[in-house]
Each structure stands twice: as structure tokens, then as C-alpha cells.
């Protein structure tokens, strides 16, 4: 439908509104699902307040899940099982090594997808589709529309014996339609069923009471003003809405109904104004057509002028090259003729040899003088051969780098719209890419277009992918592993756009991101380590207990390392994870360890203050991670005092200055179980700092150790957690 047709239809609807003659068919546009473009079927209300069919939401999540698995399978094996520890003791490590232990894939399911109605990313949270309300009001309106569309088709009784009679009413409690006789039979007078609520024949049955999706046995009886959604009393008492402002459902119903009625009355009362505005819009449309054609002609004229300049320069450059080529070829031809003459001097040489046979001195001198001059000239030519011209045209290469950059930024006059700037500190890449930018407040843009593309050295041109964004940040998903990507942003205000921002290059991790949390049951020392509730951050407390242990330390004994591991293990495939070590940390170790090695480290923990017990110090001077075995079942690197220590190696320099690097802001660990290799990365630049072989014949776990004061924070996955939606009326 064209714009003029839509405006005419809107004016027609307004006219019917004023006369109170709007029928159900005039609102069909509001009853179409933005995803499947068909009438709504069991519509669900998304967090952005738009409605989408239940099946469409599931299909969107399923398609995202398929693409997520496809990306993961490209960089790892088809099967990459992860083992979750369940036992509170060390027996769980023994258990996973026994034959027959079932390994389950715990690949996280995506819960974020773009709303088909507004294109905003919506996050369904942990409950997913189960946490969404069903839009019963919209469902009822759709059913009325369907009934109006099939008015000639009767709804038959569900309880009649064949052939069934036409139904006359539908019971909302029984969710069935009845003819008069069957309704009397199944709803006898004086019984509880006689009190059931019934309506006209319908196929749309909805519950009489709206239940809370988070607390399925509780009725909805309140309205959260902050989240703009109905809630139950449990949501208010101890749920996600405990600190939110809520009101009673009756009060919210009254307020919203008054607002809606008032707005409808306002629209109906503005019929004449709407008609005049429609006329104005028609004039503006005609003016837009004329101005658009004029702007198009002006743009073509500007480009024709550029083409003329390029053609003129092209002609001049080609003429200069042709002239230089002709001059050089002439010189080469002249020189070639000279050397061709040298070949003809073979006769001269023979003639000179015959002259040498002359015995009469007077005759010889008379002839040899001129002959010697000719021979001498030929000899000099052979001694100093130099081409008469250069064959290379390097001086005639056209430099178009600056012109290419200028032409690439060729755009409309921006009317003062500044170029947005990408915030490099806030932008990052992990499981997804988060791109953040800012724009001067005085040049507030209506929207932005984020462009990105993979940088492929083998291909000259790769097209840019575009995403329209209404905020100043965006999460970009489905990026290929181990690939550099370029990002840039353009601002739009009305129909004017700014030039593109400076490009930001981010390199994706070498493998899919591996999700896990710290294990609070296996080897976790509650006396020295403090784990937060989310189990993604651990701190080491160098307090009174450590001082007491140090007081009794004997010769050959060192303060122990406190180990903590991830709650998920892997047996095959490629995996990547990252963590941040706090700058104040004294000594921290990060890496991987096999289940067998963990048993050795964590089984039968002894008193750190015992003078008989000697434990590995964890230092490079004699630590196990500094051993020179070609392949061992663990690898840990040492980090502390704002330094990153590369472990000792027999193949490289072990001088301290060559092994000590500045501590990165975030450290990435890449485990390739198939190749038996672990690598450590600087996440800021996605640069490999150290790698070595590791024995992956057993289940491998992320392993960490702390000594003294320190802290480790697991890198949080990038998701569309904090979303902003436009305020609805």
C-alpha cells in the first residue's frame, strides 16, 4: 500500500470514528503479527510491550539457537560435551572418570532476539517464553474478527451426537460450545455447573483469572508501574518487583482506561483537523516528488562534473605515459642499431687480421691507422654497456589513496551533524561484540546505522552489514571465531546522515566462549576464599589464619596455594574463556588441569600449619607448572603484582626480563582438546602471550589458585541485558 492510500484509509477510519461506525475489519492492520504477517495466534506480550504469536517467538529462538550451534560447530567438533560437577565431595571427580558416566552438553540457549515490531533486542531471561504474558484481550479481538470474516460458517455443538447441531452458546468454564439441548443436559439447574459463565458461540476460550507466569499458582492482582506489567503479591514481596512501585489492578485498570478513552475522544474530536492535515500531507507529497527529482538532477550533475574531471585527468595521464613510452622505444631502437652494427664488425675483424699479415711497414702503417680507430670504438662500446632508457614505469603510478578516502566519505551536506565517535574503552568482543559510541548532545540524532564487516585479506571487497539502532550501543552476535571485524557508525537526523565514524577493529576469540562458574563444593577453602553469590568472582583473604600458619612455618615449607576450579569440564573440542585478575593481587595462577591432577591437588587437604607437610610453593623456581615435560595434564601461568610471568621453557630464554610482561586487563585462555594445546591471550588486543602442549586425555577443568590477597573475576558474557524501550501511551 502506498503512502497516499494509507493516508486516505486513515482519513476514512477517522470519519467512521466520528460517526461511531468503525467495524472490526477496519482494524485488521492491528491484528497482524509482525513476524508471520498473519492474524495473531496465541499472542504473547514481549518486554517492549509489542505482541508476537507464541509459535513465532519459539521459531525466532529456534533459528537463533541453530545459528549459534552452526557457528560453534565451524570452529570445534560436532560433539563437545561439558561435564557439570554435582557431588559435594572429591568423589565427583572420581565418578566422571568411571566408564558409563553420562556426559551432557550444556550449551547455553539464546534468550535474546530482535523484536519483529520495533527491532529492539529483547531479553526473555531465564524463564524464556514461560515468563511472557498471553495477550488475551488481543486474542479476543482477533477471534471477533475471524467470526466476522466467517459469519456464514456456524460453530457446531461439541457434545451432540453426529450430525451435530449449531451451537447457541459457549461455556468459558468448560471451554466448549453447546446447542440449547446439550447446554441444559450438561449444566443442570441447581448444580455448580449452572453457575458457569457462558457467552455467544466462540472458539476462543481464555481463563477467567489471569495467573502469574513466574508464580503459576498465584493470581495477578497488582500492576508494576516501573515494569508496566501485571504482577502477583509474591512478585512484590520477594520477587523481581520487591523494590518497585506497584498499584492495585483496579486502580491501574481505571487509570489506563480513562487515558485510552480520553485519547480516543480526542482523536474523534479532531476530524476536521485531520482532514486539513491530510490535505497538507498531499501537498507535501507532491512537493517532495518535485524536490526529490530536482535533488536527483543536481546530484547527477555533480557526479557528471566529477566524471569529466576524471576523464580529463585520465586522458592527460595516458598521453604522458604514451609519450614516455615512445621516447624510450626510440632510444632503444637507436641503441639496438648500434649494437647490430657491432655484429656486422665481424668482417672488420677479419679484414684487420688480413692487414696484420702485411710485411711492408709503410703500407701497414698507412692502412692500420684508420682501422685501429674503428676497432677501438667497437671495443669501448662493449666495455661500457648501459641501456639507453629505463623499462620501468614506477614514476607513472597514479596515487589515488587520498582521493579514494575522500570519495569514500562522499555524502550529503550534513547541515552540522557531527560524526559519532566509537568509544574504544567501552566497546569489546567476547561471545558477542558490544559497540558503544557517543554523539554531541547539541547534535542529537534520531537514529544510527551500525555497519560491520569481516576483514578478509584474501578478498578485495566485502560488503558491509547494516543495523539500524535507536540508542548509542548495540550487541552484534553471530560473528565468526578467530576473525577481525571492522565497525563504524553513521548518524541520521531526519533524512540527513553524517559521514561514517572512524573504524574500530576488533578480533573475535579463537574459539566459542565456554560458560562456567566457580565450583563452591570441590576444593573450595571457605577459610581463605570468599565467593560471591553469582559464583563468578572469588577473593583471597590474607587474614589472621594465614598469619598463624606462617608463625609455625618450618624450613622447606611454604604458604599453600588455595585452589578453586570451574564447575564444568570438557573432553574434546575448542573452548575459550576469560577472566580479570585484580591489580592488587599478590599471586594468582590461571590455566587448566585434568581431573586426575585435581584429585592429586585437592584430595585429603592437610593443615597448612603442619611442619611435616610440604606443599608446592607455586613459584616458578620449582613449581610443577615450570616443568619441561613436552605434555603434562595441566598448565598454569603466574600473575601477580601487576605482572604476567611466562613459565620457564628449555627452548627459550629464562632471563627474568624476557619472561615478565605487564599484566593485561583481561586474560583469555584457549583450550584445544583435539590438538592438546592451551594458549593464553591478552584480551585487549587478542594477542597470544604464551602457549604449550597439554595432555587432554582426561576431562579438563578451568583451574585457578590464589595466595595472599587477590581476586579473580570471570568475564561476563555480552548480552542485551539492559534495554531501553520507547514509552508507550
UniProtKB/Swiss-Prot annotation:
It catalyses: S-ubiquitinyl-[E2 ubiquitin-conjugating enzyme]-L-cysteine + [acceptor protein]-L-lysine = [E2 ubiquitin-conjugating enzyme]-L-cysteine + N(6)-ubiquitinyl-[acceptor protein]-L-lysine. PROSITE patterns: B302_SPRY, COS, FN3, ZF_BBOX, ZF_RING_1, ZF_RING_2. Zn(2+) binds at residues 212, 215, 235, 241. A zinc finger (RING-type) spans 33-84. A zinc finger (B box-type) spans 154-192, 207-249. Residues 613-622 have a biased composition (Basic and acidic residues). Residues 416-511 form the Fibronectin type-III domain. Belongs to the TRIM/RBCC family. Interacts with CENPH. It is an enzyme of class 2 (transferase). E3 ubiquitin-protein ligase which mediates ubiquitination and subsequent proteasomal degradation of target proteins. Involved in chromosome segregation and cell cycle regulation. May play a role in the acrosome reaction and fertilization. This is E3 ubiquitin-protein ligase Trim36. GO terms for biological process: acrosome reaction; microtubule bundle formation; mitotic cytokinesis; regulation of cell cycle; regulation of microtubule cytoskeleton organization; spindle organization. It comes from the Eukaryota. Residues 509-723 form the B30.2/SPRY domain. Residues 606-626 are annotated as: Disordered. Expressed in testis. Strongly expressed in the neural tube region in 14.5 dpc embryos. Its EC number is 2.3.2.27. Residues 356-413 form the COS domain. It is found in: Cytoplasm; Cytoplasmic vesicle, Secretory vesicle, Acrosome; Cytoplasm, Cytoskeleton. Pfam families: COS, zf-B_box, zf-RING_UBOX. GO terms for molecular function: alpha-tubulin binding; ubiquitin-protein transferase activity; zinc ion binding.
Amino acid at each position: 500500500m502506498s503512502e497516499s492510500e494509507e493516508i486516505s484509509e486513515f482519513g476514512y477510519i477517522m470519519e467512521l470514528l466520528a460517526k461511531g461506525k468503525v467495524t472490526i475489519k477496519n482494524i485488521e492492520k492491528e491484528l497482524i503479527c509482525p513476524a508471520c504477517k498473519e492474524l495473531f495466534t496465541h499472542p504473547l506480550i514481549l518486554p517492549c510491550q509489542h505482541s508476537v504469536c507464541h509459535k513465532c517467538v519459539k521459531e525466532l529462538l529456534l533459528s537463533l539457537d541453530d545459528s549459534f550451534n552452526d557457528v560453534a560447530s565451524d570452529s570445534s567438533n560436532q560433539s563437545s560435551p561439558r561435564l557439570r560437577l554435582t557431588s559435594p565431595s572429591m568423589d565427583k571427580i572420581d565418578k566422571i572418570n568411571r566408564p558409563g558416566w553420562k556426559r551432557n552438553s550444556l550449551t547455553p540457549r539464546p534468550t535474546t532476539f530482535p523484536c519483529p515490531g520495533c527491532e529492539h533486542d529483547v531479553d526473555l531471561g531465564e524463564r524464556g517464553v514461560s515468563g511472557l504474558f498471553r495477550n488475551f484481550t488481543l486474542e479476543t479481538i482477533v477471534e471477533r474478527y475471524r467470526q466476522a470474516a466467517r459469519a456464514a460458517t456456524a460453530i457446531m455443538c461439541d457434545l451432540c451426537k453426529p450430525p451435530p447441531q449449531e451451537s447457541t452458546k459457549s461455556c468459558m468454564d468448560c471451554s466448549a460450545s453447546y446447542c440449547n439441548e446439550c447446554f441444559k443436559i450438561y449444566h443442570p439447574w441447581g448444580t455448580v455447573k449452572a453457575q458457569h459463565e457462558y457467552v455467544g458461540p466462540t472458539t476462543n476460550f481464555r481463563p477467567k483469572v489471569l495467573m502469574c507466569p513466574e508464580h503459576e499458582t498465584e493470581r495477578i492482582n497488582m500492576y508494576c508501574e516501573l515494569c508496566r506489567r501485571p504482577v502477583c503479591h509474591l512478585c512484590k514481596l520477594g520477587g523481581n518487583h520487591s523494590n518497585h512501585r506497584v498499584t492495585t489492578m483496579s486502580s491501574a485498570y481505571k487509570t489506563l482506561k480513562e487515558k485510552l478513552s480520553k485519547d480516543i475522544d480526542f482523536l474523534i474530536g479532531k476530524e476536521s483537523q485531520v482532514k486539513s492535515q491530510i490535505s497538507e500531507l498531499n501537498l507535501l507529497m507532491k512537493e517532495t516528488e518535485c524536490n526529490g527529482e530536482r535533488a536527483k538532477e543536481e546530484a547527477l550533475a555533480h557526479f557528471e562534473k566529477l566524471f569529466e574531471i576524471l576523464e580529463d585527468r585520465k586522458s592527460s595521464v595516458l598521453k604522458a605515459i604514451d609519450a614516455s613510452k615512445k621516447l624510450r622505444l626510440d632510444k632503444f631502437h637507436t641503441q639496438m642499431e648500434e649494437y647490430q652494427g657491432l655484429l656486422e664488425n665481424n668482417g672488420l675483424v677479419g679484414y684487420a687480421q688480413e692487414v696484420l699479415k702485411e710485411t711492408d711497414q709503410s703500407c701497414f702503417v698507412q692502412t692500420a691507422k684508420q682501422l685501429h680507430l674503428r676497432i677501438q670504438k667497437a671495443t669501448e662500446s662493449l666495455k661500457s654497456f648501459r641501456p639507453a632508457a629505463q623499462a620501468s614505469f614506477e614514476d607513472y603510478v597514479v596515487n589515488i589513496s587520498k582521493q579514494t578516502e575522500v570519495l569514500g566519505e562522499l555524502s550529503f551536506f550534513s547541515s552540522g551533524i557531527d560524526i559519532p565517535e566509537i568509544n574504544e574503552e567501552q566497546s569489546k568482543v567476547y561471545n558477542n561484540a558490544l559497540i558503544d559510541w557517543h554523539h554531541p548532545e547539541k547534535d542529537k540524532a534520531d537514529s544510527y546505522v551500525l555497519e560491520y564487516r569481516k576483514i578478509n585479506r584474501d578478498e578485495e571487497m566485502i560488503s558491509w552489514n547494516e543495523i539500524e539502532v535507536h540508542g548509542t550501543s548495540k550487541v552484534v552476535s553471530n560473528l565468526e571465531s578467530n576473525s577481525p571485524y571492522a565497525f563504524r557508525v553513521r548518524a541520521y537526523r531526519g533524512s540527513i546522515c553524517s559521514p561514517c565514524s572512524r573504524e574500530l577493529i576488533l578480533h573475535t576469540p579463537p574459539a566459542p566462549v565456554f560458560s562456567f562458574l566457580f565450583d563452591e563444593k570441590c576444593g573450595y577453602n571457605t577459610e581463605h576464599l570468599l565467593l560471591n553469590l553469582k559464583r563468578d568472582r572469588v577473593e583471597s583473604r590474607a587474614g589472621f589464619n594465614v598469619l598463624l600458619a606462617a608463625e609455625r612455618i618450618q624450613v622447606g615449607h611454604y604458604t599453600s596455594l588455595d585452589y578453586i576450579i570451574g564447575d564444568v569440564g570438557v573432553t574434546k573440542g575448542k573452548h575459550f574463556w576469560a577472566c580479570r585478575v585484580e591489580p592488587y593481587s599478590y599471586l594468582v595462577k590461571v590455566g587448566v588441569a585434568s581431573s586426575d591432577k585435581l584429585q592429586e591437588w585437592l584430595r585429603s587437604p592437610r593443615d597448612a600449619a603442619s611442619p611435616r607437610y610440604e606443599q608446592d610453593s607455586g613459584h616458578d623456581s620449582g613449581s610443577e607448572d615450570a616443568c619441561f615435560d613436552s605434555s603434562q595434564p595441566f598448565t598454569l601461568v603466574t600473575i601477580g603484582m601487576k605482572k604476567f610471568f611466562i613459565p620457564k621453557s628449555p627452548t627459550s630464554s629464562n632471563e627474568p626480563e624476557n619472561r615478565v610482561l605487564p599484566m593485561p586487563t583481561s586474560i583469555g585462555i584457549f583450550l584445544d582438546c583435539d590438538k592438546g594445546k592451551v594458549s593464553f591471550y591478552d584480551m585487549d588486543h587478542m594477542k597470544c602471550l604464551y602457549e604449550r602442549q597439554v595432555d587432554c586425555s582426561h576431562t579438563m577443568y578451568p583451574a585457578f589458585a590464589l595466595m595472599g590477597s587477590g581476586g579473580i573475576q570471570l568475564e561476563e558474557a555480552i548480552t542485551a541485558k539492559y534495554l531501553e524501550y520507547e514509552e508507550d501511551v
